[in-house]
Amino acid sequence: MDLKKKHDPLASFPTLSFSFGSGRTAVRLHLLRVGSDCQAILIGGESPHIGAVVLAVPRISLKGNAVSCDCWVSPAPAHKDYLVAQSVAQKLCPALNCVISVSAGIHSDHATESELQTIHANCSTVVEMALSAITAEPF
């Protein structure tokens, strides 16, 4: 498997934004093309902020037949945003075959377990929306 880019899936989309959910569980994903790499900002809830940053770098998978990635995770103290940031990075990095930095901050005061599950699901949905939009047309 060759990690060289055959095309740049973000070339036609220097910036993209996706939103899903409502109220306390709403999330937004912004993608910004940075050269041949990507910066993702995942925010939501009542108090968007930066709670974690994940850097993902593509590599050949351990099985050697696909692209995978290595991740470095930096959470702010007492923040769990790294959970969604890492999940987003692990989905986008191999799909885009580029280095990606994901900054995440989603906060709603006293969120219930149900709201937290909805937030996680909404994060997955915006990533799928982004991947569908980016890969919808051949380049």
Whereabouts are the PLM-identified features?
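Conserved mixed alpha/beta catalytic, RNA-binding, or beta-rich assembly cores of soluble enzyme
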Residues: 17-95, 99-108, 115-123, 129-137
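Short, Gly/Pro- and small/polar-rich lid/capping loops
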Residues: 2-23
